[in-house]
Amino acid sequence: MTTHVVCLDGTGQTRLQPNPTNIALIFNAMGGLIVDADNGSFESTLAVNGPVVQVGKYLPGVGTEGIPLFKLVEQTVGAGIAEQIVRGYTFLSRNYEPGDEIIIIGFSRGAAAARCLAGFVVGQGLLNPANYHPENKNAAYLRGIAAWYQYRAGQPWLARDSDLTDIFLKLGETVPQLTPADFVEVERILAVAVFDTVNSIGIPKPEPGGWLGYDFVIANTDLSPKVLNGFHALSADENRANFFPTYWTPRNNITQVIFPGSHSDVGGGYPEPDLSDRALEWMLPNLASHGLRFDLHNIRALAPNPTADGHDDGGSFPWCELPKKPREFPTTVFGGSPAFTVDSSIGERWGKPVNVLPANVRSDYEAIGLFAGGKPLYP
């Protein structure tokens, strides 16, 4: 039995950048034999006493390298998002065998893609390797696009107010028509683990008022019952309106924890990783308890510091020109049970004279509803 791990990074992020995100660090920690696949992606193979026990795929974020075949799809479902989803899907289709396990991990828009990929895999099934040549990448990508098209057509939450429906329908005429025999069922996914899923996905388009909106949203709020565990690390301090998080509807085995700092102070990528190291320190043992193999000797030492300076992800152009909206954390979402817990680092940070870089602004957790009277509002 092999565990297959797909790691989907955030916008503009790559594995080899000087300050890797938590997604790249998790992939690196998995160890094994790592090879440069193509177009910014990497694959890993971990064997123990002979048999392969874990394989991994790292995919860079939107706005990095890409495959020309996907350009029309990207114009339809958002730059790079479809490519991340389909490349993760074809990797799993190429390697998965019945009885194997799957873990999917993502950050930011890669988190939205991870959640969508999980629903795609358990909802549509993986490609049947008996009906095509998995090593022929172009053939695999075309079949992956066809499978994604078929799945997307049946998921109303994947397309809202899309002005591009006609383009997508035309795309459906250019890819193979797949039948149920072209798929193999996947009974379960062990875990989906995400850092700060953002809900604005798709093609930026003009909106009244002059700022960029998004054509549709792809991150579902319901985690499939075939996904056994969901882990979500959320930012308390991110304030960009179009980076508002997409929560999961509460159910058993979903854990959503709020951490201090901005979007990238949770998902990583800054030269000062003091805050993002805490979210990673929380995520790794959760994944390990559900099948992920990793060795911290494969990455730099983690040094979380809850009172370290944070960062203002929205302080530079073009984000500084777009609307701001403080995060909201309702005590329940969708009428369900308590949706969140507050990490202990929030309590350590609350009331301290900490700064947000580059602006000298204190974090105020009472203002966004995490604390009242000095006590956390969540378990």
State each model region's role.
Residues 1-379:
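Active-site- or binding-pocket-proximal scaffold segments within functional domains
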